[in-house]
Structure formats: structure tokens, C-alpha cells
């Protein structure tokens, strides 16, 4: 088996003039992987390349694939992902993965940007202040999840109510309100963070529903899962597929009520 022409062209656009040493050390493996990832998978559906790479970066963050993430930053930019969009993906990951897992990715992103001649810091994307982040976060939750989120931040048992407060003012008020990505794109990268890290099926199902409410329908989410199988493998992909199917059923049941 040889590397297909489609795979070769796609790889060249990702990494111009780069010659992988795997062709010398692991020729059988790299032929199968490249033909699968960069021909069979990318040509399976009509997802645009920019969206594909946004999901790949978010998935690699969730999966903690630091070396592959670093390699994919220039590739993503070659397919239309802007530096500010890459930074927004990294920033939002903190709310879902924690700074302990995101810190190395932020450092690697800055290194790649420096190598690419991208001046830091990038233009500010913040739209909230300390004074209005709570109310802005609540409005964002309502916009994404529906009117049932009104007053969410002050509900629940007293001993844990502060966590809901933080979810509203920090996760949504600090991150989701930023410019650089749309609500639909922010829900999409959250879906990728959760699908890739695994073990958070209730949250993944909830955010699959939020994606569907914001224009990322069931088939689109299945396409996202499919496009990222080369990066996270089959077990977590199949778990994510189950969550998407469950979310679609729950959405249909709600529509029938």
C-alpha cells in the first residue's frame, strides 16, 4: 500500500515541505494512518476544514495530546483557523479541564505563535467586567440552554450554591461571553473537551443537547466524532456517539411534551 494522492496533498497543505521520519522508521504504519486520517476520514463528509481543525484542537486538549496539539497549530492556521480562535479554545478549556491540564498547552501555543511571528498579547476579546460578569453569564446560559437557566446561580443546596454561582460568573461570564468564537462554536469545543476526556457522560449529553439547540444538529455532531476518531480512538468516540443519541432522544421527547 502506498500513501494516496489525496492523503499526500492534504498532508502537504497541513505541513508544507515537511518530511516525516516515520516514512523511514515506520513506513507500514504511516501509510495506513495517513491514508485513513487524511483521505478516508476527511473525505467522509462535507465538514469544512476550518471547523474540522477547531474540533481537532479542542479534542487534543481534552485528550491531553500535547505534542500533536503543538504540531496541529500551524496546520490549523493553514486551513483558516485564526490565532485568536486558537487562544479562545485554550482559554475556554480551563473551565472544563482545569489549569493543571491546560497550562502546558497555553505555553506551547505561545511558543508556536512566537515561532510564527505572531505578536502577543493578541487583541482583547473580553466583553465583561467584574461588575457585570454574573448577569452576563446568566444571560449567556439562558441564550444557550433556555429560560430554565434563569436564577440557576442562586439555586440549589446552600452548602454548594457557590459552585453554581461560579459556573455562571466564571465559566459563562468570563469565557463564553468573550468574542472570537460564536456560541455555537463555544458549545462545539466544549463538546469536544468532554468527549475527549471521557468519564463525564452526563455533562456530555447535556452539552450535546445545547449544541443541537444552537444549530449543531445530531448528524453534525456525529461528523465531529467521526473526524476525530484518528486522534482519540474508538472507545471514547463510541461513548460520545451514545451520548449524542441519548441527547437526540431527550430533545425529541421534550418536543413531544
Residue spans of the language-model regions?
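Acidic, glycine/proline-rich low-complexity segments that act as flexible tails and inter-domain linkers
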Residues: 1-50, 70, 102-183, 205, ...
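Short, structured motif recognition centered on aromatic/hydrophobic residues
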Residues: 51-60, 89-90, 185-195, 204, ...
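Long, hydrophobic/aromatic-enriched structural stretches that serve as scaffold segments
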Residues: 57-60, 65-71
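A short structural micro-motif
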Residues: 61-62, 79, 92-99, 195-196, ...
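Hydrophobic/aromatic-rich structural module bridging two neighboring secondary-structure elements via a short loop
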Residues: 72-106
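Short acidic/histidine-centered micro-motifs embedded in hydrophobic/aromatic stretches
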Residues: 89-93, 108-112, 192, 224-228, ...
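Extended hydrophobic/aromatic segments used for targeting, binding, or gating
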Residues: 206-208, 214-228
